[in-house]
Each structure stands twice: as C-alpha cells, then as structure tokens.
A protein has these predicted regions:
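Pro/Thr/Ser/Gly-rich low-complexity, intrinsically disordered linker/stalk tracts
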Residues: 189-246, 285
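Solvent-exposed loop/turn segments flanking beta-strands in beta-repeat/beta-sandwich domains
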Residues: 238-264, 288
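Short S/T/G- and acidic-enriched coil/turn segments that sit immediately N-terminal to beta-strands
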Residues: 273-279
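Beta-strand-rich modules
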Residues: 279-295
Length: 295
C-alpha cells in the first residue's frame, strides 16, 4: 500500500529542486510536469509488475489525495478548488486505475459535506463515476466527520450522512477511517456507531476478479469432535495445485436447526478464520444448530 506522497506537497513560491535531474534524465520530455508524472507512472507500473511477478495474490493499492483535478483545469474534473493530484503532486491516479496498475483505490476525501472548496458529496460522486474500474474505498477523516454538524439535522454529526452517501453508490465498496487512534478512542461515538449501526456483522474481503476469478474448492470432511475443551468443528482444506487457487480464509456460518441456509446474510457469520477448526459454543446441549463452512 502507498499513501498520498508522490512529489512533495508544494510550498507557495517554491519549486521542487529537480532541474539537474530533468536535464540529465529528461527522456526527451520538454515539459517538466509531464516528466514528473511519467516518473511516478513508471514507479507505480513497476511496483505493480514486480508484485504480480513475485506474489500474484498480493494486492497493491494507493490512497491518493482527495482531488484528482479541478474542473477549472479539466472539464472532467470535480467541482472543487483545491490542491490537485495531477497538477500539484504529479500523480495521475486515473491512469493507474484505467491501466490496471493498482488493485484498489482509497481517495482521501477528508473534508466535510458542504465544504466550500472540496465538498465531500461532490467528491464521492466524482470518484464513484470516474474510478469504478478498480475497487473503490473512501478515506474518511474521523475528527472532521464528528466535529461537523449535519446541515439537515444539526443535532447530529456528519457520520450518518456520509455513510448513507457511501452506501447509495454501487461502485463504492466501503471506507477506511483516518486515523485509527481516534476510532479506538471513540471520538464523537465513532467506534460505537461503527459497531452498533454500520458494521454490526463481519464483512468478507471484496472479490477481485481481475486478479483471479476462480473460487477455491469446497472444504472437505466437516465434522464436530468432542475435545477436553468442549466441541470443536474441524474441516480439511480443499485441494489446490496452484498457489492462486489455495483457500486462505474460511467463513463459518451458524443457523438454527430448521432455518433455511442463506449465505448472503452476514448476521449468520460467527467466524472468519485461517484455521481449520472452530471451537463451538456449548450451553446445555439442548439447542441444535446447523453450521456451514466455506472457503
């Protein structure tokens, strides 16, 4: 994973001192901005190719600054007035996405809904439209979210409105919270809301069919065994000849004895594990359950 640091964030009136490098290694470019973008493009492309060659199951992605380009500089840009990936950091994020050089994208939309220069609502719709060819997650600023009131409901912060926006856009697959310490400290009840409202149930890693579209085989020999610590569910990994076909994680579901099995209902997930076993809860032995294990 790479964060948002490509060329340095610019200081007013200062240029990055790379004129000697440009003169020596310009590769025929007459425009320094194009040369800088190409330097970053080459880096991203070569990292992607190296990861694919060495460990093709590993994902490589970025979390770029939240504005690609302003509409003032590009008709396809966002209706914003701020620093730009393309023009100021020399990071052509859309090129990386469209060429398949990154496996996911997490734009840092750290502003609030209604920000005069970089409106969260505006930006999330822009990224959802223009960066949908790779998994898209939204980078969220926890403190700015909880410290800003919802314009439609001033008694609450902007977390509910932002979550509603995310979930209304089919190409947005989730969000990342910045930074973790503020989630851990439960700033503005953020962690409580995640646990009780938005992420009550475990989530599976989104599919990446552009990397591998073949699911692992079915688990084998699922059985319950009594141990000195109580009942344990065991299973055997499916066979796989290729590294890409190996099962990495297993999902354990639990249903009532006569309940219809529905693997699309995340409320029935009791474990996501890399182990080949799961200790079963045991109360009085009278309540019966069905367990399903998938790879």
């Amino acid at each position: 994973h790479m964060d948002d640091y490509f060329y340095p964030y610019p200081n007013p009136g200062e240029d990055f001192p790379d004129h000697v490098s440009f003169a020596q290694y310009g590769r025929g470019y007459s425009n320094k901005a194009d040369w800088r973008r190409d330097n970053v493009n080459v880096l991203i492309k070569e990292i992607h190719e190296t990861v694919r060659e060495c460990k093709p199951w590993v994902k490589f992605g970025v979390s770029p600054f939240g504005i690609y380009r302003n509409k003032k500089n590009d008709p396809n840009g966002s209706d914003t007035r701020g620093l730009q990936n393309y023009d100021d950091l020399y990071a052509d994020v859309l090129m990386w996405i469209n060429n398949g050089w990154v496996d996911y994208n997490i734009p840092q939309i750290y502003w609030e809904i209604g920000h005069p220069a970089a409106d969260y609502d505006n930006l999330i719709h822009w990224w959802a439209k223009h960066a949908a060819s790779r998994p898209l997650f939204i980078g969220q600023d926890v403190m700015r979210t909880v410290n800003k009131a919802d314009a439609r409901n001033p008694l609450q912060n902007q977390m509910p409105a932002k979550m509603k926006l995310q979930r209304s856009l089919p190409t947005v697959q989730g969000s990342c919270q910045w930074y973790a310490a503020e989630v851990g400290d439960n700033a503005g009840n953020y962690r409580t809301m995640l646990e009780k409202e938005y992420h009550r149930y475990p989530a599976l890693i989104p599919e990446s069919p552009f990397m591998d579209d073949k699911a692992p085989g079915k688990v084998k020999k699922v059985k319950m065994v009594w141990t000195y610590e109580g009942p344990v569910l065991f299973w055997t990994a499916p066979k796989a000849k290729d590294e890409m076909d190996k099962a990495v994680q297993y999902v354990v579901y639990r249903f009532d004895k006569k309940e219809k099995v529905n693997l699309d209902d995340a409320s029935h997930i009791v474990a996501i594990t890399r182990d080949h076993f799961y200790p079963l809860p045991y109360n009085d032995g009278k309540t019966k359950y069905q367990y399903v294990v998938t790879a």
